Amino acid sequence: MTKAIPKIGSRRKVRIGLRRNARFSLRKSARRITKGVIHVQASFNNTIITVTDPQGRVVFWSSAGTCGFKSSRKASPYAGQRTAVDAIRTVGLQRAEVMVKGAGSGRDAALRAIAKSGVRLSCIRDVTPMPHNGCRPPKKRRL
């Protein structure tokens, strides 16, 4: 019997260097700015923090999911605190305005973390959208 000739290239493409947390290695390094705007979006399921420069261009963003929290832990106040610390430490802000949107549990914890981080806050605004009796709200859950 003749021996099978080994194939030089395999059909299956192998991704080299991609790990489970590949997002962190593929992310561009954040610009360092001294003055900016911190947007805190606190929903009932997650907390998202976006840091922009004064013109509104996004410099860095972080969420409870990217900080390593999964499922219901993303909605915790501790996740909001860690998210805020991660965003500020990466960018290196010194002066900032804070805009808070939403009524999630990470909202107050994120504000406390921003205040304790040493960033000088010029103003804190609540920009939560409030309807003037617009759309009908969804029906209440029956458990």
UniProtKB/Swiss-Prot annotation:
The entry's keywords: Chloroplast, Plastid, Ribonucleoprotein, Ribosomal protein, RNA-binding, rRNA-binding
Location within or outside the cell: Plastid, Chloroplast
Molecular function terms, GO-annotated: rRNA binding; structural constituent of ribosome
NCBIfam families found in the cross-reference section: PRK05309.1
Tagged with keyword Metal-binding: no
Cellular component aspect of the GO annotation: chloroplast; plastid; ribonucleoprotein complex; ribosome
GO BP term (any one): translation
HAMAP family: Ribosomal_uS11
Subunit structure: Part of the 30S ribosomal subunit.
Protein name: Small ribosomal subunit protein uS11c
Pfam families registered for this protein in UniProt: Ribosomal_S11
Name of encoding gene: rps11
Annotated organism of origin: Oryza sativa subsp. indica (Rice)
